């Protein structure tokens, strides 16, 4: 993977600190710590995840990093505090200047204006559950819907509303009735991205994304 234009060598400190959090080691791709750091730095989790794996390599740079901070978390925390106080830390303004759209991964984690309890990421997870249920079971009382609502911190009714929109998007159902919902735009975009793709890939992605909410 080519070097990200926003990556700085100082960010190794941030990855090392995250790596050392219990349980020590490479964190899941969409763990909360990994995603929050990616949003802070405006660098996709996939890139940071790959960089974190390099902390296990024996290279001169990584060796020095471990020698200086591996057994001294307080020293590491001080250096990170200084890093975050530096001008330009986490500032992507220069990189995004003249660019109207941020990287899609950032938008995927932002609350929907139409329904702040949802994000595109949550809609991806809901879409995966949609494919595991039948229309008659897409009701607030269904245990799987109740469990998912608790996990992603929304309501069963909101999940059912999203599933109703997905039913309209689903060509196999041939629904001709009109659904009035504030989620139509957001759900339609998620369906366009994943609704006609490989369900196994969607299932894996949804399971990976759930890691953030655990």
Feature roles, as predicted:
Residues 1-214:
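Intrinsically disordered, charged low-complexity linkers and terminal tails
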């Amino acid at each position: 993977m080519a070097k990200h234009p926003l990556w700085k060598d100082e960010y190794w400190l941030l990855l090392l600190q995250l790596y050392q959090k219990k349980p020590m080691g490479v964190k899941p791709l969409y763990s909360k710590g990994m995603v929050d750091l990616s949003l802070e730095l405006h660098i996709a989790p996939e890139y940071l995840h790959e960089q974190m794996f390099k902390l296990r390599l024996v290279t001169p740079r990584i060796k020095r990093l471990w020698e200086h901070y591996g057994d001294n978390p307080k020293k590491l925390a001080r250096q990170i505090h200084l890093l975050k106080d530096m001008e330009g830390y986490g500032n992507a303004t220069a990189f995004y200047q003249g660019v109207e759209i941020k990287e899609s991964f950032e938008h995927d984690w932002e609350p929907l204006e139409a329904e702040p309890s949802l994000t595109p990421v949550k809609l991806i997870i809901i879409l995966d559950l949609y494919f595991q249920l039948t229309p008659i079971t897409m009701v607030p009382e269904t245990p799987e819907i109740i469990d998912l609502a608790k996990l992603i911190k929304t309501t069963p009714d909101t999940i059912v509303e999203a599933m109703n929109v997905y039913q309209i998007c689903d060509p196999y159902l041939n629904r001709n009735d009109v659904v009035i919902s504030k989620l139509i735009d957001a759900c339609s975009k998620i369906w366009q991205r994943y609704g006609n793709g490989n369900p196994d890939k969607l299932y894996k992605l949804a399971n990976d994304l759930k890691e953030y909410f655990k």
